[in-house]
Amino acid sequence: MSENSLTITEILSSIRTLLVKHNKAKVTQIEKELLQAVAELEKKFKQQVQNFNELQQKIPNLQKVNEEFRLKVEKIQEEAQKKIQEKVAELTIKSKEELENAKKYVIEKSIDQPLIIIDQFEIALSYAQKDPQVKNYTTGFNMVLDAFSRWLEGFGVTKIAIEPGAQFDEKVMAALEVVPSDQPANTVVKVSKSGYKLHDKVIRFASVVVSQGNKTE
């Protein structure tokens, strides 16, 4: 029995001596309740001691868990930082590529008018072959057309080379008309308007007349 229990027992003995003459049953009840309270306190105290001992045993394990957790957190931080750096590098490269493409194709929106001028010179040259009065101007027309074409080439604009007899290619051609012809089906009979590329991008499809083949076949 602990010191606290002995002290309470002595108190109970004194109380019993003082009150035994007045109410023996009441004293017995009080004594019983106090003894129960003491027993409960002792039980709780022993439980707390046991809990404390168990906690002391767990401390090394807790330290190990904390160290493992710290290492995991550091690993996650390193991986996150690596992914962020990769994403930044990717966005930087993408931004540079987009900027280069923007520079590369900036002329696209304003190229229509120069191409119309070239079309007019090409039409004039085609008529010049038939009209002797205009034929005298072909040399000058060709010089201007060549100079203008070279100027456009400086911006990356080039004519798509298509000749009659070529196979129709929907990637660079648009069929204005399909006509009977001695040439094989799906063959270019005539180039009505030249097509152009800006670097590797088709900015205007060539307008062509396409053969449907010989009707007698």
UniProtKB/Swiss-Prot annotation:
It is found in: Cytoplasm. CDD domains: GrpE. Keywords: Chaperone, Cytoplasm, Stress response. Coiled coil: none annotated. It holds the Pfam family GrpE. GO terms for biological process: protein folding. The keyword Chaperone applies. Participates actively in the response to hyperosmotic and heat shock by preventing the aggregation of stress-denatured proteins, in association with DnaK and GrpE. It is the nucleotide exchange factor for DnaK and may function as a thermosensor. Unfolded proteins bind initially to DnaJ; upon interaction with the DnaJ-bound protein, DnaK hydrolyzes its bound ATP, resulting in the formation of a stable complex. GrpE releases ADP from DnaK; ATP binding to DnaK triggers the release of the substrate protein, thus completing the reaction cycle. This is Protein GrpE.
